[in-house]
Amino acid sequence: MRVILLGAPGAGKGTQAQYISEAFDIPQISTGDMLRAAVKAQSELGMAAKKVMDEGGLVPDDIIIGLVKERIEEDDCANGCLFDGFPRTIAQADALRTEGIRIDNIIEIDVPDEEIIKRMSGRRVHPASGRTYHIVFNPPAVEGKDDVTGEDLVQRDDDTEETVRKRLKVYHDQTEPLVGYYRNLAIEGSDDAPKYSCINGIGQVEQIKQDIIAALKQ
C-alpha cells in the first residue's frame, strides 16, 4: 500500500505518519532523505542533484521522480510506503501518474487555520534541555518557567503567529491544490485513481490515529 499524507503544517502529519508506518510496516519516504542518500552513494541521479543544489537551485522534478522510482524498488518497500512531504505540486503528482507509480491512498488531515495557529503559536521551549510546553495544552507549573530548572521558556521564531500565518499561506497557495487534484481523481474513478479520505484532525491523537487506520483498511 502506497500512501500520501496531506495537511497543513501543524496538522499532526508527523505524529500520524509514524503510526501509519508502524501499523502497516511501511517506511516513511521523504525527498530530503532520498536526496541525501543518493548524494552519499554518489549515484548518477545523486550527482545530478548535488550539482543543482551546489548552485543553489531547486532539484528538478525529473530527478526527484527518478529517485522515487529507485527508492520504491528497495526491499523495505515490499509492503508499500508512506510519502512524507511529496508530492508538493500538481506537476509532481502528474509525473507520478505518467511514470506509472501507483498510489493507493490519499489521507488529508483537515485542521482549520485558527486551530493550527493556536497549536503552534502556543508552543514554548526550554532551550538548554529541549523540553517543550504549550500554554494551553501542556502548560508549565509556573507560567513562562521550565518545570525542572525554573529557567525562562522561549517561543521559537518558527512558532510566532506571523511566521505560522506565512507558512499556512505558502501551504494554501502551493500544496493545497493537491487536495483538490486527488479528490477529483477519486470522484472520476479512473483505474489508477487512489482512494481519497479526509480525516478530521481536531481531537485526541489516538482517535485521529484510529480514524486514519480505519480509512486505510477499507
Swiss-Prot record:
SUPFAM superfamilies: P-loop containing nucleoside triphosphate hydrolases (SSF52540)
GO biological process, one term: AMP salvage
Binding site for AMP: T31, R36, G57, L58, V59, G85, F86, P87, R88, Q92, R156, R167
Catalysed reactions listed for this entry: AMP + ATP = 2 ADP
Location of region: NMP: 30-59
Residues annotated as binding ATP: G10, A11, G12, K13, G14, T15, R123, T132, Y133, G203
Compartments where found: Cytoplasm
Protein EC: 2.7.4.3
Alphabetical list of NCBIfam families matching this protein: adk, PRK00279.1-1, PRK00279.1-2, PRK00279.1-3, PRK14527.1
HAMAP family (alphabetical): Adenylate_kinase_Adk (MF_00235)
Oligomer status and interactors: Monomer.
Function: Catalyzes the reversible transfer of the terminal phosphate group between ATP and AMP. Plays an important role in cellular energy homeostasis and in adenine nucleotide metabolism.
UniProt domain comment: Consists of three domains, a large central CORE domain and two small peripheral domains, NMPbind and LID, which undergo movements during catalysis. The LID domain closes over the site of phosphoryl transfer upon ATP binding. Assembling and dissambling the active center during each catalytic cycle provides an effective means to prevent ATP hydrolysis.
Name of this chain's protein: Adenylate kinase
The species this protein was found in: Chlorobaculum parvum (strain DSM 263 / NCIMB 8327)
Record lineage: Bacteria, Pseudomonadati, Chlorobiota, Chlorobiia, Chlorobiales
